[in-house]
Amino acid sequence: MSEFWHKLGCCVVEKPQPKKRRRRIDRTMIGEPMNFVHLTHIGSGEMGAGDGLAMTGAVQEQMRSKGNRDRPWSNSRAL
């Protein structure tokens, strides 16, 4: 009888869940931008060492004034 329970125990073992594979994205799945609006251009010299942080605030202010966005720009991330 113990042989029966041993064999039954081998069949009842919990099987690990299969890992979900992430779908790979290729370029055919990506379309053109829908609501792209070019607000400003920042050159590498404009974000220089001296006034880089002050310039960042000015750019954010300019971006805020460009359009009535539903989502306000976040200032929570420090540079």
From Swiss-Prot:
Membrane topology type, per the record?
A: Lipid-anchor
For bias kind Basic and acidic residues, which ranges apply? Answer: 63-72
Where it sits in the cell: the answer is: Cytoplasm, Cytoskeleton; Cell membrane
Molecular-function GO terms, alphabetical: small GTPase binding
Q: Tell me the disulfide pairings in this chain.
A: none
- PROSITE patterns linked to this entry: CRIB
Q: Which GO terms describe its biological process?
A: phagocytosis; regulation of cell shape; regulation of Rho protein signal transduction
The keyword Membrane belongs to this UniProt entry's keyword annotation: yes
Q: Identify the domain of life.
A: Eukaryota
UniProtKB keywords: Cell membrane, Cell shape, Cytoplasm, Cytoskeleton, Lipoprotein, Membrane, Palmitate, Phagocytosis
Q: Lipidation, kind S-palmitoyl cysteine: residue numbers? A: 10-11
The segment annotated Disordered runs over 48-79
- Say if the entry is tagged with keyword Glycoprotein: no
Q: Which residues form the CRIB domain?
A: 30-43
Per the record, its GO cellular-component terms are:
cell junction; cytoplasm; cytoskeleton; plasma membrane
- UniProt domain comment: The CRIB domain mediates interaction with CDC42.
Family named by the database record: Belongs to the CDC42SE/SPEC family.
The function of this protein is: Probably involved in the organization of the actin cytoskeleton by acting downstream of CDC42, inducing actin filament assembly. Alters CDC42-induced cell shape changes. In activated T-cells, may play a role in CDC42-mediated F-actin accumulation at the immunological synapse. May play a role in early contractile events in phagocytosis in macrophages.
What does the subunit section of this Swiss-Prot or TrEMBL entry state? Interacts with CDC42 (in GTP-bound form). Interacts weakly with RAC1 and not at all with RHOA.
Put simply, this protein is called CDC42 small effector protein 1
Organism of origin is Rattus norvegicus (Rat)
**Underlying gene:** Cdc42se1
